[in-house]
Amino acid sequence: MAELGELKHMVMSFRVSELQVLLGFAGRNKSGRKHELLAKALHLLKSSCAPSVQMKIKELYRRRFPRKTLGPSDLSLLSLPPGTSPVGSPSPLASIPPTLLTPGTLLGPKREVDMHPPLPQPVHPDVTMKPLPFYEVYGELIRPTTLASTSSQRFEEAHFTFALTPQQLQQILTSREVLPGAKCDYTIQVQLRFCLCETSCPQEDYFPPNLFVKVNGKLCPLPGYLPPTKNGAEPKRPSRPINITPLARLSATVPNTIVVNWSSEFGRNYSLSVYLVRQLTAGTLLQKLRAKGIRNPDHSRALIKEKLTADPDSEVATTSLRVSLMCPLGKMRLTVPCRALTCAHLQSFDAALYLQMNEKKPTWTCPVCDKKAPYESLIIDGLFMEILNSCSDCDEIQFMEDGSWCPMKPKKEASEVCPPPGYGLDGLQYSPVQEGNQSENKKRVEVIDLTIESSSDEEDLPPTKKHCPVTSAAIPALPGSKGALTSGHQPSSVLRSPAMGTLGSDFLSSLPLHEYPPAFPLGADIQGLDLFSFLQTESQHYSPSVITSLDEQDTLGHFFQFRGTPPHFLGPLAPTLGSSHRSATPAPAPGRVSSIVAPGSSLREGHGGPLPSGPSLTGCRSDVISLD
């Protein structure tokens, strides 16, 4: 019990680094804060205190608090009686009780040596390196050896020597391959590896900090530094095996020397080893994977049934499962579907592409779930092999609850041709009329006015909207009369009138002309003007929609608001109007818009025939006015 209490006291005095080393030595999790690490170490001490763990605790404690020894002059002080000094002068230690005198209190500042030096690390610890899939070990040239710290300096140095046997030398020389550029490579190589000096499990490659390696006096190239993850962080190299074959002496009589320089770290030791290996390719590993065999398809079917089994406690049940036959790495159809045994998904990836990717940069990470997928855990899925062989024209399948599957054909969606957007007021669309032969049933045109309320009692069903053929009715515009007739704030649209000569009475009665009050009364000086006399041609027909609307009170006042009668507008018209139309047109009532043109009765009688000859203004521009 006393020894257990002493060990507990030692553990409680450890720092984070010592606690991590102790937990790593025992194979426990060494991540967490100091109080968590301390609790784990104390639990380890209470639960299973093996002799090796006790020795490790004592070793770490001796490193943490090294004991000091006395020099020759200090040992002479111990032979004197307490309270006296070598020269008879009062000693400063005379006032200290003899029981409190320890060897550590008698040490000088520069005469400190270890009374019990720490136990040296084993030269050949029981360290095993993790096997590499792309390298096959042929022999061990240097067993895993500890990079021991021999001094208290920051930088350490170690020397190693190895020699090749004639058989090993012959293997290297026969594997030589000449590469482009006068370079030669060897498939059988001399490989140098570093790792942590831990015996709990097979160790991965791990470089010591500030590592420099010289082989036979020549500096060995190392992998480049990785970019630092944060500012101020010390750059690190990617830990991987080092090929020292180009620097080695390929001789059976001359040994090879290796000099290693690194920075020592308290509580962390490293190990070095040299192997003779044969480098493999992705194709060789694929053949080895095929040689392992294909997994029984029933395993995958059982996994599918397990995933699709309805959970009674869940309200949502999965009845089918879609899986792609495309490789997530190359976006191509699978050829050798494989996945790791540790993966819980059904999606497979192509084994050839996966091995080629790891040959360039070994990560061994599943491209589907981003979990570790080492080469030893890869399997070829037999169910997917059957699917690929039986279904060659689909890229996706669907699994059912019973483990069966069916191909998912890609649906070709018909392209929808969207009609061009219509323009005009109230969403009305007007389509151009094709000149040519038209059927007689299309001569009657129906116009739907959206301004009439749809809830009228007279209409049982809304009339079908039809497109009106268009012709342009020319209305003269006087030269130099800009601003004489201007539109108001309401937008104006284009007048569309049918091309035929007669219209039905239903069209004339459907025009809601009584709902448009005049915007402004007309002045007395332009009420007697007849604008139809200024049309360019005599044979031009008036549009019935224009003729009818001119008789109503909202004719042009809704679209043209008169803002004044400038003298330059009425000046050129006075001679013409006085000689031609002033006598033929009766005086209209003031304030009616129809007085601008003519009385409605006279226009209705002659709208179907040609107009009488009359003067017209040269250079007049035809305009189109909308009445809807």
Swiss-Prot record:
Pfam families: PINIT, SAP, zf-MIZ
Region (Disordered): 72-95, 573-618
PROSITE patterns tied to this protein: PINIT, SAP, ZF_SP_RING
GO MF terms, alphabetically ordered: ionotropic glutamate receptor binding; NF-kappaB binding; potassium channel regulator activity; SUMO ligase activity; SUMO transferase activity; transcription coregulator activity; transmembrane transporter binding; zinc ion binding
One record GO biological process: protein sumoylation
Signal peptide start-end: none
Known partners and oligomeric status: Binds SUMO1 and UBE2I. Interacts with AR, BCL11A, GFI1, HMGA2, IRF1, MITF, NCOA2, as well as with STAT3, after treatment with IL6, CNTF or OSM and with STAT5, after PRL stimulation. Interacts with PLAG1. Interacts with ZFHX3. Interacts with MTA1. Interacts with CCAR2 (via N-terminus). Interacts with TRIM8. Interacts with PRDM1.
Domain remarks in the Swiss-Prot or TrEMBL record: The LXXLL motif is a transcriptional coregulator signature.
Protein's name according to its UniProt entry: E3 SUMO-protein ligase PIAS3
